[in-house]
Amino acid sequence: MKIAMLFPYTPSYREAIYKLMDKELDVDWFFCGNAKRSLKMLDYSLLSHCDLTMEEKTFLGPVVYYKGIKGLNLQRYDVIICAGVIRCLSEWWLLQKMGKGMRKPKIFLWTHGWYGKETKVQKLIKKFFFRKVDGFFLYGDYAKNEMLKEGFDAGKLHVIKNSLDYDNQLELRKEMTLSPIYKDHFGNDNPTIVFIGRLTAVKKLDLLIKAVGILKQKGEEYNMAFVGDGEMRGGLANAAEENGLTNDVWFYGACFDEKTNARLVYNADLCVAPGNIGLTAMHVMMFGCPAISHNDFKWQMPEFESIIPGQTGDFFEYGNVEDLARSISHWFATKSNSREEVRKACYQEIDKHWNPHYQLNVIKTVLGIIR
């Protein structure tokens, strides 16, 4: 089975799943060679049969098209997998033109699918755009359930989850042992809450500092470690000072050594991501750390589904700092003596669903490569 993967660009975190697909499937890769984004991009030289001749061009406002797509001879493929970018005219063209007068490739979208916050107009546009799609690879069950509510065919909806560099992280995980890294830094045995990622406004990390401040006034003391850097670092430092937490916060900074990141996460007791948790959920659970994030799922990223309340973390009411404080306090009140049990639950969640091997199996099963 010949497969075409056609995307404007690909972030570097997808390296593991794409390399696995490249190894085990007959795939040609098509990306826009000129596409620029603020995130780190994949090194396309890691993939065989990679074509970068397409160019992403602006048509009007946010609307784009892929210059050169018509010359790719996509009719020769059995399956085309693309991103489902509704604001891209080329993807509309692809869904309309494929198969006219020739054998039609099946077209799958690897996409968020549905958020649950769409307006009536957005719903109409999406349904019209999706009507000729043969199948969807969705990041989560939430999106699948939202699409079922909208009347989509269940047989076309396939949950593929997401993944990071699982195999390399697994080797690091096997090396991990408990260490006094936080006791040495803070000089106490208080539980440590970690956040790993960019310190940006959308992460709403000020809520975490305020919540820990509330708990400190009630006699509950916690350490906080921020592993990452970003625009909000100064503001967070000021918030810590205002809440009497200067000595309880460690701004570790950005760390690009995954073994060090693993050690910092493994030895923490809880991750709190008051904004959208996204990839952070997979990262921390890979190394056995549970996570708390908000419960307004239409504003979440798909990885929130790795949080199983009472097992791998918990949720708090979106934007409610008092409820975040309650959630943190409740977690430690009920789980402080079950750290290793929680660690194993986090491992199990990632090992079962959030890894490239799971994703590849979904692709092979859906495409009929394995049964």
Please place each PLM-identified region on the residue numbering.
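Short hydrophobic beta-strand element within catalytic cores of glycosyltransferases
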Residues: 290-299, 314
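A short, histidine- and acid-enriched strand-loop-helix "catalytic/donor-clamping" loop
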Residues: 89, 103-124, 132-135
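Conserved donor-binding/catalytic core segment of Leloir-type glycosyltransferases
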Residues: 183-203, 209-212
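Acidic donor-binding loop of glycosyltransferase active sites
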Residues: 263-276, 289-290
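A charged, aromatic-enriched C-terminal amphipathic alpha-helix characteristic of glycosyltransferases
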Residues: 333-367
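Donor nucleotide-sugar binding/catalytic pocket of nucleotide-sugar-dependent glycosyltransferases
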Residues: 131-181, 188
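Nucleotide-activated donor-binding/catalytic signature segment of Leloir-type glycosyltransferases, i.e.
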Residues: 227, 234-255
